Amino acid sequence: MSKYDVVVVGAGHAGIEAALASARMGKKTLLLCIDITNVGYMACNPSIGGTGKGHIVREIDALGGEMGINADKAAIQKKMLNSTKGPAVFSLRAQEDKVQYQKEIIKTLEVQKNLDLKYEECEEIIVKDKKIKGVVTNKSKYECKAAVIATGVYLDGEIIIGPYTKQSGPSGYKRSERLTKSLQSNGIDIRKFKTGTPARIYRDSIDYSQLEKEIVEESETDFKNTEGFRLPTEVEWEWFARGGQIAIEQGTF
């Protein structure tokens, strides 16, 4: 049985930061993810920052985290929200190339010292005398001194589309069932919170002549507070459709 100081279950944004923080503090760390396509995956709106969140990305960066650095690498558009108001409410938001974001963060994880990234599903947390002793995956067992559970919405996940319900992780990915039961058997209450994701459309199906273009100047501000860190990106435009409830009901966008 391989031994680790810390095992992190789940390689979403939280799991990635936890694993990197542990490894960078000198702890032998294992990061578990069901599949490579789940690492740093943006299942909802592919953006980083924004109102109420942009400052958190900066705080993660100040603590040595990776999200801000990676967001700068994969950004296709940046905008400072609330720029007409006072500096206290300025909020940097970056729209991301979700595929590039994944590629860049995987590169970072794979070269990080003290960190192993394995594509295995964690099925059980080993607990003895109320202390975590290890984890069991669909392929192996690992001994550890501590475990971080960062599974997001994968625990017994469901997808709801109108009247249609399907047992699944986000975007049709595999959900975690055995780990849910393991956590419950150890007295941990599992609750679900519903999130909403807008429908996606093909960009080639849009009649842009009916939309308004907002010219967005390339931001000189990055999430990473390092002067000169800018990377070349192809800036995308923002398009607006004005309507309301009637336009939504009649499909006249």
Model-inferred region functions:
Residues 2-14:
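Beta1/beta-strand and adjacent pyrophosphate-binding region of the FAD-binding site
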Residues 8, 18-19, 132:
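Conserved phosphate-binding elements of NTP-dependent enzyme cores
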Residues 12, 153, 246:
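Flexible, active-site-proximal loop/turn residues at the rims of small-molecule/cofactor binding pockets
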Residues 116, 141, 231:
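Short aromatic/basic micro-patch
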Residues 126-141:
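Conserved beta-strand-loop-beta-strand element in the redox core of flavoprotein oxidoreductases
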Residues 224-253:
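Functional-site microenvironments in short loops/helix caps that host divalent-cation chemistry
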